[in-house]
Regions:
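Nuclease catalytic cores that cleave nucleic-acid phosphodiester bonds
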Residues: 2-5, 9-150
């Protein structure tokens, strides 16, 4: 099973909507990111750890991700600590665009996906879902036409 370790603040910073939202309402941007990740990982066999800087304002519940706050350390330090203490890093993917953290993860044997690339993957998966829904709708409409024709 793949384990994703996600640099939450970095990911938020690379998404224009979440980045704008974070400037106004930090908690809301974090909640929205968790919702996006829950939807993306819903049918995937993966462990997800999402790291944020600072202390939690309110608890964020997630169906798929374990949310960790760095408290009096940086999220990068917590992520590095987690990577160092994993039994095996070969099935670990770190999502970040922080060069220092990405380099550390690579040296430790983790796969690294840039935040921008990960957002594109999520976006592409949403497009596929929309196309699938449209195909099903068209098929249902065609079936209804066939039954009405008789």
């Amino acid at each position: 099973m793949i384990h994703y370790i996600i640099d939450g603040n970095n990911l938020i910073g690379k998404d224009s909507f979440l980045n704008k939202l974070q400037r106004k309402e930090k908690q809301s941007s974090r909640e929205k990111l968790v919702l996006i990740l829950d939807r993306y990982f819903i049918n995937k066999k993966a462990n997800v750890t999402l790291h944020f800087d600072g202390y939690p304002n309110e608890t964020i519940r997630s169906n798929k991700a374990r949310v960790i706050y760095s408290e009096n350390r940086t999220a990068d330090e917590k992520i590095k600590y987690q990577i160092e203490h994993l039994k095996s890093n070969k099935n670990t993917t770190v999502v970040t665009s922080d060069n220092n953290l990405a380099q550390f993860a690579k040296v430790c044997g983790c796969k690294v996906v840039a935040s921008e690339e990960f957002l594109k993957i999520i976006q592409d998966s949403k497009s596929g879902d929309d196309e699938e829904k449209r195909i099903k709708e068209i098929s249902n409409q065609e079936i209804l036409k066939l039954f009405k024709a008789k």
